[in-house]
Amino acid sequence: MPTKLWPLAAALLLAPLALGQDERPNFLLIIADDVTYNDLPLYGGPNISTPNIDGLASEGLTFNRAYLSMAMCNPCRTELYTGLYPFRNGSSWNHSAARTGTLSVVDHLGRLGYRVGLAGKKHVLPDESFRFESVAGITNHREPTPVPEFDTSDIEEFMGREGDEPFFLVTAFHEAHAPWTVGSPDKFDLAKLALPDNLADTPRTRGQFATYLAEIEVWDWEVGRVLDALDASGQADRTVVLLTSEQGSAFPGNKWTNWNTGVRTALVVRWPGRIAAGARTDALVQYADVLPTLVSAAGAEAGDQFDGHSFLPVLRGQTADHREYVYLMHNNVPEGPPYPIRSIVDARWHYIRNLQPEALYFEKHMMGAFRTNWFWETWLAASGPSAQAAINRRAVMLANRFMRRPAEQLYDVAADPYQMRNLIGDLGLADVRDRLATALGRWMQSQGDPGASLDSEAMWRNAREGRHLPPRSGP
């Protein structure tokens, strides 16, 4: 996909930020649930249509290389709302809790005079750290329905409320989290679907992939409804809109992993009059950078209270780069037995360290009694008609790739987005491996991350009860 990067000269076209009380922008964050970034047409996805997302991107800046530290809902949202990496904020597992006293976007923007609200999925704890004003309208649908109920009147009221206070509003949708129950999957010709390279081509996989794609199209419709509500509120011209797809989908190799299609996310930012329309950037950013960016855009100094750093200069077109590395981790408890992972990404390479490679990876929602998807067993079937032999062999290969992993993995991000070719044994890349491994170890040490011992039932339960391991004292 061609990349149109910001020219540095664009900075000359953008006025410097010097905000008075009535010039502070509003912020509207639109977030999906378990949408793999490159299933979206904006990132090359070939199967669906998303006119509202594409329209938003045509009016703003698309980040080609945005990431989140953990490919699970609770940890990535805690990172997003705190500007801190998982070990320092405390949410180092799914269904866990931030450290007692952790400050969030509610505190940081609230102190700057913002009303801070959330409509839809919250999934962050403790409540004392995330005291969003609750805004009605977005509900979770567990029964099949082509079009979900979605009343935007309270969302519009929150954005258009009279007064001098600017707003920050999260609209957090449940699409496309499994089980995939909304939308119209029957519209897809299963035989013509282009399956991603990391999915086994079985009939059940194709059928469930269609139900997942249908939910993404519903999310796009919901995005359009939210943007219509913003227009109706009269606040569109002074509102920064951020759209992100969260972690990857609940298919093997995406969510619950440190592979590219798990930890990489869509990110689009629209800021009328401040961002050139239809631009793209290869700047490396991650969720920990978002809150410092909002604080800076609101006219305050982000300082050193965050792990992340403001990418406001990227938005302004003043630089094409942001950070040298993004930092990633995974603790498998409570989604399965321990399988700790740490990894690091730079402009080209992705290095993964599996801390217990002797273990068998298992995730209960895809592979066990809690599963809501029914394709996994078809990946394990090695027998069948001769015409299916090659498909079956590939399915078993992909299942083994998912369950059994080496101690180290190294991938060329641009050449291998589905990360099917592990280059760790390439002697010509030994210097790359050593550089990334050293940087990863330095990051873990700076956070106070003990590594494999963190991925345990006891550690997870202690964290949920507010008894975390102590972090290091500063970023």
Task: Describe the function of each predicted region.
Residues 12, 19-409, 417-442, 451-452, ...:
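Formylglycine-dependent sulfatase
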Residues 8-14:
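Hydrophobic helical h-region of N-terminal Sec-dependent signal peptides
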Residues 456-460:
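A glycine-rich phosphate-binding loop feature that marks nucleotide/adenosyl-phosphate handling sites
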Residues 1-8:
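Bacterial N-terminal signal peptides that target proteins for export
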